[in-house]
């Protein structure tokens, strides 16, 4: 699954940058990293790439994720999925949750690497177990579809719930849908309506539609 740029940016800033101040950087590399962030805010991705490259080469996982994102989306550098995978892998192997999510997506889609659902699930799971909501959603979806794992509606619901409780709108919709259909959980229209409402409030249009139908007694 290719995530919108805004989603990977959110994942990076929400998880990778959480460790920013604890990283053992001297003043100059830290300033260099910050200058890269400021460059992206101006739309100057080439400058950001040049600033982050030496940090990534020195083994900084956050910079590695950002380089992977740059290569994946052609931001300041020629688009190259193989290079994106290389940098995501380096960060993922250091335990970066955003990188694990992205590496899983590259395996699921077969971009820059041979398509492999089992390998995708491996990386989604590592990110999900660190509490990354988008990875928890993805794990729920692969259990729902039986991609790389044995199809299991109960496991799908378990992961939807974890992501939903962290505020992921699509997971909230999927959890509501599971309650509506009784997939992996007992039918409960009241709870379905509750989760559809939360999804709607978080911008998931399908949640609004289903909430309205339940409210009008059409389902």
Predicted regions and their residues:
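Bacterial N-terminal signal peptides that target proteins for export
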Residues: 1-11
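C-terminal segment of classical bacterial N-terminal signal peptides
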Residues: 15-23
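Cleaved targeting-peptide boundary
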Residues: 23-32
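Short helix-capping/linker turns of helical repeat alpha-solenoids
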Residues: 27, 39-44, 57-60, 73-75, ...
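Hydrophobic face of amphipathic alpha-helices that form TPR/SEL1-like repeat modules
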Residues: 31-39, 51-55, 66-73, 102-109, ...
């Amino acid at each position: 699954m290719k995530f919108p740029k805004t989603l990977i940016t959110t994942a990076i800033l929400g998880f990778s940058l959480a460790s920013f101040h604890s990283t053992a950087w001297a003043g100059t590399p830290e300033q260099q990293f910050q200058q890269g962030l400021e460059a992206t805010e101006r739309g100057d991705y080439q400058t950001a790439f040049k600033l982050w490259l030496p940090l990534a080469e020195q083994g900084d996982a956050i910079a590695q994720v950002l380089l992977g994102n740059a290569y994946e989306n052609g931001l300041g550098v020629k688009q190259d999925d193989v290079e994106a995978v290389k940098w995501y892998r380096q960060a993922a192997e250091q335990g970066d949750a955003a990188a694990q999510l992205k590496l899983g997506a590259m395996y699921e889609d077969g971009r820059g690497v041979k398509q492999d659902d089992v390998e995708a699930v491996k990386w989604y799971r590592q990110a999900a177990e660190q509490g990354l909501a988008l990875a928890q959603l993805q794990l729920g979806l692969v259990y729902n579809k039986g991609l790389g794992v044995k199809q299991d509606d109960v496991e799908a619901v378990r992961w939807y719930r974890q992501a939903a409780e962290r505020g992921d709108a699509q997971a909230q919709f999927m959890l509501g849908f599971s309650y509506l259909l009784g997939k992996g959980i007992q039918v409960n229209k009241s709870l379905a309506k509750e989760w559809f409402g939360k999804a709607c409030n978080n911008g998931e249009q399908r949640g609004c539609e289903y909430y309205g139908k339940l409210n009008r007694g059409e389902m």
